[in-house]
Regions:
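C-terminal motif of bacterial Sec signal peptides marking the signal peptidase cleavage site
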Residues: 13-14
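Surface-exposed loop/turn elements that mediate protein-protein interactions on large endomembrane-trafficking
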Residues: 42-64, 90-104, 137-153, 187-228, ...
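Sec-dependent signal peptide recognition
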Residues: 1-7
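Blade-loop segments of beta-propeller domains
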Residues: 59-64, 68, 97-124, 131, ...
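Structural signature of eukaryotic scaffold interfaces centered on beta-propeller domains
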Residues: 70-73, 117-123, 162-170, 221-243, ...
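Beta-strand-rich domains and repeat architectures in extracellular enzymes and scaffolds
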Residues: 33, 41, 53-87
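Short beta-strand elements that form the blades of beta-propeller/WD-repeat-like
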Residues: 78-83, 125-131, 171-184, 240-257, ...
Length: 426
């Protein structure tokens, strides 16, 4: 068997209990100050957030030849992979052994043609596939179809936006949408986060507070299904379920919220302060942006841990990784160089500009860098490595020269990387 894909999985510190962080301290909402007394550092260490590092080569069989990974989840006993081509979910053990496929392609009951995403409830041993033609379908871990919990029309009617996310936490479902919109809606229906009941009916809608007062402009600048237009779009809402607590940060806002299940409310957990200029709203939210729009500061995602909150932002072609200390309120900043890429697209006279904003830590547990490609179950961060890939691979020489806490883990990583490089291509 040949191992083509390699996962570095870290378990976050502080995930052994079910204790949830209180949303508001007695002294009020903690403020993460990104403009005062910030210490710039050359690197941020993975060991500050991680309890342990696992090196997992995925077993390749005739039934599990994966070209790449488009979506994945790690649970306590399994690894779940979508590689975006055959529309099945591939189940592996936590050591990387292939177990079975989930899903059934077709037009009949319990079947689907394609799907958008999937979620896993390990307690119930259920996999939820969000199909594009047959609603939400539930399968057991062996791949057997169990039931349909929402039909196609319910799913289509729920959203008015191109960009959507589903979340499963504590056996409860939630949904998120971010514009661009693809159809007109009433401005009161321009929601950003929604809690769902067991039948996927909306329980309570929440708005991104930045949208208030801008609803008519957002709706007017929607995508046009008949012709190409430079519609408005926003970055995805950043969501985390660290230690069982659902938290989120809407794009363009300065608050991290936590969801309170007892009251079905979003409560402020952290306020973010910066005196950086954020730029004109329209210019920074066009699909095809002018180069100058990248010169403004913005926070795109955050990652909570036991002792720290990491925030990922950018200004110009630099990626800013902030590390906020929960105990003393101090903030460290590490800057990395990125690059704005340009791609010509038919029907437009100017290029589509994009920039990667990776969350990268110094892997002092195993060597090299650790890029958080995925996070899962509120307790795992995953770095996906692809032999031969220019972007998703590690320089073995860099690992060999790294200073690490555990030399045996470093040797294991080097051995697995060298083996994968030799054996990956049939």
């Amino acid at each position: 068997m040949k191992s083509i894909l390699l996962l570095l999985i870290i378990t976050l510190l502080g995930c052994s209990s079910n204790m949830k962080q209180e949303p508001i301290s007695k002294s009020g909402i903690p403020v993460i100050n990104l403009s005062e007394d910030v210490s710039t550092v050359p690197s941020l260490l993975l060991s500050e957030a991680a309890e342990k590092l696992e090196i997992v080569p995925l077993e390749m069989t005739d039934e599990s030849v994966l070209s790449d990974i488009t979506e994945m989840q790690v649970t306590d006993h399994n690894i779940w992979i979508d590689h975006g081509r055959e529309f099945y979910i591939y189940r592996f053990s936590r050591t990387g052994k292939f177990l079975n496929r989930i899903g059934s392609i077709g037009q009949g009951p319990g079947e689907y043609v394609n799907y958008l995403t999937f979620l896993v409830d390990e307690d119930k041993k259920e996999v939820y596939i969000f199909s594009t033609n047959n609603g939400v379908l539930v399968y057991d871990f062996e791949g057997g179809f169990k039931k349909q919990i929402s039909d196609f029309q319910t799913m289509v009617g729920m959203f008015s936006s191109i960009y959507k996310q589903y979340i499963l936490n504590d056996h409860k479902f939630f949904a998120i949408q971010n514009f661009g919109l693809y159809r007109s809606v009433d401005k009161d229906s321009l929601w950003s986060f929604v809690s769902l009941d067991d039948n996927f009916q909306k329980k309570r809608l929440f708005k991104n507070p930045v949208h208030v007062g801008k609803e008519e402009q957002i709706i007017a600048n929607r995508a046009n299904m008949d012709r190409m237009v430079n519609y408005w779009m926003e970055y995805l809402t950043s969501v985390d379920i660290y230690n069982g607590q659902l938290t989120l940060k809407y794009p363009d806002t300065d608050t991290i919220y936590c969801y309170d299940d007892a009251t079905n409310q979003l409560l402020p957990q952290y306020a973010i302060f910066t005196d950086e200029e954020k730029g004109d709203y329209e210019a920074t939210h066009l699909w095809f942006k002018d180069r100058k729009a990248f010169d403004y500061f913005s926070i795109f995602s955050y990652y909570p841990t036991k002792d720290f909150v990491y925030l990922i932002g950018s200004k110009g072609e630099e990626v800013y990784t902030y590390c906020y200390n929960k105990k003393d309120g101090s903030v460290r900043l590490q800057k990395r160089q990125s690059a704005i890429t340009e791609r010509d697209v038919p029907w437009f006279s100017f290029p589509l500009r994009q920039m990667k904003r990776d969350f990268v830590l110094d892997n002092d547990l195993g060597g090299g860098d650790f890029t958080v490609d995925s996070r899962s179950s509120g307790k795992y961060w995953i770095d996906i490595l692809e032999p031969g890939g220019d972007e998703n691979w590690i320089d073995i020489d860099q690992i060999k020269s790294s200073t690490v806490i555990d030399e045996s883990k470093k040797k294991e990583l080097i051995r697995v990387l060298e083996s994968a490089t030799e054996d990956s291509n049939p």
